[in-house]
Amino acid sequence: MAAQACRYTVRDVGFADLGNERYTFLCFVDDQVPSARVEQLGQAAAVLFSDANVWFQLVNLAKGEHPQAKRLAKRKPGVPVGLLLSPDGELAWPLNFPATKPDNPEWSFLASVVSSPARDELIKKLIPAYAVILFVEGTDAAQTKRARSAVDDAIKAITPLLPQMPKPVDHPPEVVVVPAQRVAGESVLLWSLGLDAEPVPEPQAVVLMGRGRRVGQPLRGGLVTRTALQEALAVVGQDCECGLDRVWMQGEQFPLSWGRAERTAAYAQLGFDPDNPQVKAEISRIISRGPNSRPSGATRTASSNFDQLALGYSEEIIEIDTQPAVPAEPPAVKEVIMEPETEAKPEAVEPESTALGQARTIWWTLAVIAAVTLAGGGLLLLRRSGH
């Protein structure tokens, strides 16, 4: 019986939010922060984080120290400060309260956690497009130009193959560019995807799909090649069959807000509701039963798995010693003396045959002794009967 293909592709799975990959935003205040500001922070968080993949927690340090507070730099009393934790809690990114005086600083402060110009553009393109390549320019113009050509070539190479995918997508991959001078304003986005959050000479690139989920490893400098990008793009359209490594479907998401408008647009594009509880349960089973799957409820990142992964198969490096081993001491050379041929000696009897012959001899000996004993006993009986 032929195996039934999975009804979902890797891209489809990328739209599902299983609820176990939430960021945590800790907003630290103290007694010197005005109560009105604390209240405004709570109200803004209720709106901004209601549809986001971020948990909000207000922490008053005046009521006691918090274990994560040690990750903060020197804090100014009376000024809120934030700390964004990765889903696994291992990484943290600090956010400072606006130093300028915007109309609503509380809103601007919290909105920077889930929104930015590049993220807004990504969300608009991720829903209709097959995938999106986030390209971060470097300060080195020559490297940036070469890497951008690799990005464009990868998209040109994969686009003719889209109609042949298990679930064709009409919209080819797109590109979102972060100029070098805008890197600082996209620090949360870049940090969450494993990219450098400050200007560097090398350009950077990463493939994204679905609800802002990363596909493959982030690429830097000379690693931004057409081949690497094309491989990641090819995986996006594959069936999520059991043989495909689940690490491709479990890349990190960036912090974002996914409201009613995004859910409606995704439903129209996919033909199913990725937020439907039954769909989420089915996708959760698909992810959990494949190789390199993440245990239920675990939030471990997928980065470590990619070290041994390439398009669904694993590679291991086997060390081979190409130089012959040199013995500690050279082996002694024995002198061989040719002797004249002599008469052939009889072949030695194999140990097994010798042992068998010895056993037979012993049995015959015992039999003769027994016969003699019986004969002697018989003669004695005859003599006694004669008397």
Region roles according to the model:
Residues 3-387:
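Non-globular targeting/processing and membrane-anchoring segments
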